[in-house]
Design a protein with these regions (language model features):
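Classical protein tyrosine phosphatase
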Residues: 361
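Long, Pro/Ser/Thr-rich low-complexity/intrinsically disordered regulatory tracts in eukaryotic proteins
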Residues: 2-348, 355-358
Length: 361
């Protein structure tokens, strides 16, 4: 209760940076449109096929035999009853659904495997990876590197905005022809957000007009709004980005700052209830909206996970050369939890880039 009181009473500190005025007022409504983007429709893509019922049931029995052989005979009896009972009617409903949707399984898969799962996002859902080590002599070099990274990221975003990404293809089953792949996931990666819900999360897909003009930088568990486009002249320069990042890097930790990012590591219903309290404050509601609409989150960590974090794991199982990759991946996946760097994240946002104290990125 004390943490929540401090958060609601004090709100979040304003960014030390100036932002275009239009970012400081309520922007347009969030879109919940889950239809494929126009670029995904440029080439005719086949609808996801519905396997015939007998094939589906035979595959199901084969899996039961592999994982629960003691239940195989009982399952066979249930399968026979299903095949002679409601099975054909449900199969027909699937075939009808296929005629009305681009992919009949997407909505169910998304809700069942992800949005309805109450588990915390770190480890259970969110992936992570480690880039090649990049050593910096000082903060200036690190800021220049991050600014260059963001510049290239913005270039890629603009490529997506003009639908300029080449359609990917893979060999068809016959091994002779090439099948075009749906590119919707690429076009949504910067414009998608996972909002917590008590019963189920909500996937927010933003339109181009209301997102992508700013990034969020996390440092010392505090979140800064950094504009990447100005209302009067378009994209800011790489040097301007460097200077803004440097100013954030030079800020000192404030023990009074509530580690609000740790809420995104909680089980989803708990985070959803906490969010309901947060949005009662207009200031917190505005800041949450900025987080939802940002292009990405850049996490600048002034620490690393201690070498004892993975002490039970043998060194030969976690080191490659002079790098502890087990620790690096823990750093990327969850930041070590509340005792370490886990609050310097916002796990609901799709794209994170994490800069460690040493060479980790």
């Amino acid at each position: 209760m004390q943490f929540r009181f401090l958060l609601l009473a004090e709100g979040w500190r304003d960014s030390v940076l100036g932002a275009p005025r239009r970012l400081l007022v309520t922007l347009g409504s969030l879109s919940r449109d889950s239809s494929p983007c126009p670029a995904a429709k440029e080439e005719a893509l086949p609808s996801l096929p519905v396997p015939d019922l007998e094939t589906t049931l035979q595959k199901y029995l084969a899996q039961v035999e592999a994982v629960a052989p003691n239940h195989l005979e009982r399952t066979r009896s249930l399968v026979r009853a299903f095949l002679s009972g409601p099975g054909p009617k449900l199969q027909q409903r699937l075939l009808e659904r296929r005629q009305k949707t681009t992919n009949w399984a997407t909505e169910w898969w998304l809700n069942d495997m992800y949005l309805s799962c109450p588990l915390a996002l770190p480890i259970n859902s969110n992936p992570g990876l480690a880039a090649k080590p990049k050593r910096f002599a000082n903060q200036q070099e690190a800021a220049v590197f991050l600014a260059r990274f963001l510049t290239e990221l913005l270039n890629y975003q603009e490529l997506l905005d003009r639908h300029g990404l080449e359609v990917e293809r893979m060999k068809s089953k016959d091994g002779k022809t090439m099948q075009s792949l749906c590119m919707a996931q690429h076009y949504q990666m910067f414009r998608i957000y996972r909002r917590p819900g008590v019963n189920s999360d909500e996937q927010i897909i933003l339109d181009r007009a209301s997102s992508g003009d700013h990034i969020i930088v996390a440092h010392h568990n505090q979140f800064y709004n950094v504009p990447v486009r100005a209302s009067d002249r378009g994209r800011i320069t790489e040097n301007e980005l460097t200077q803004q990042l440097l100013r954030i890097m030079e800020t000192k930790a404030d023990p009074r700052t509530p580690p609000v990012g740790i809420l995104t590591t909680a089980k989803r219903p708990a985070w959803a209830k906490a969010r309901e309290e947060l949005v009662k404050s207009e200031r917190n509601r505005h800041n949450l909206e900025l987080l939802e609409r940002c292009l990405c989150v850049i996490c600048i960590d002034d620490d690393v996970l201690p070498t004892t974090f993975n002490n039970p794991i043998r060194k030969e199982d976690r080191w490659i050369g002079d790098r502890d990759y087990a620790n690096v991946l823990h750093h990327a996946l969850h930041g070590g939890g509340s005792r370490h760097l886990g609050a310097n994240r916002w796990f609901d946002k799709t794209v994170h880039a994490i800069l460690g104290k040493t060479e980790d990125f």
